[in-house]
Amino acid sequence: MSRAKSPSPTGIPTQSIIWAAIGWATLALMFYLFLSAPTDGPHIIKPEECNKVVKDLIVRPNWYRYGTYLFQTVAITFSGILCLRNWRSPKIISGRNVWLGLGLGILSWGIGNLIFGYLDFQYQSGLIAGGAKGAANLVKTFPSIADIFFTATYVFLSWGMAMSVIGRRLNLYPKQWGVVGAVGFIGIGLAAYVTFGAGGGFTLDTGKILNIVYALGDIWLLIVATILLLAFWGGKAAQSWRLLGSAGIAMFFSDLWFNYSINISDICKAKPYQSGEPAEFFWILAFILWGMAAALEFDLSSRPTGRSRRG
């Protein structure tokens, strides 16, 4: 990455973008690791779905939750912009549709995340404000209108990641294809356990259908990410593709943990889902890696070729 010094159209050197991304990821990691403990409480609540009062509810403070959304939104915004910059540039040699899909997917996820965050704050605030008397007509965080954007995210990301491998001469050895198959099999097993095992069996309600859609999208991202890592393991010119693969894997694990947390939550036992889990850092990591990949690919594509240097 030491050669990535060419300036972007905004005048910011690519190397500065890379270091800023690494710095933001480091700050986010420390924020999640050291400040994520629930400290607000205990509260006494009476949710509608519970037969009795729930005591000793301890939640994460709002200032911490605001901080997590700040870290996520900044990473999403800059990564989405960098991906769309690649799509608009005629110099990109890697296929502009790759970056269009990634950019739209990232920004769609960001919109859905902000909507989900608003609903999550409304739900928890109303629940605590209701106290032992109970709170009625609370907003639902899942499923909600935010899932429209999350579903669109999987469509765009799956398309963008697919474009990164379709039409390319991958030249994987049989053993490498075996690794891809094994990773896919493990991913299917993990997703099935989270969706159906921890999720309470097979049903066809809206929430379960969405979980299945998300699981399928995550499995696809994991498989494509594995292919990219195996096919583009060496060489500086392949750095952006390795970062794309790493981002897909980070997205898989963060989504898997989110679905698991939702499925095992039980508000009646004072164990509700709470945003701000340390595992959410992998969302930020995924978006940062996508943004770094976009910056490196733009830098590589903007360099003069040997022919042009010879005049």
Model-predicted regions and their roles:
Residues S2-G311:
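Polytopic alpha-helical membrane-helix bundles and their juxtamembrane interface segments
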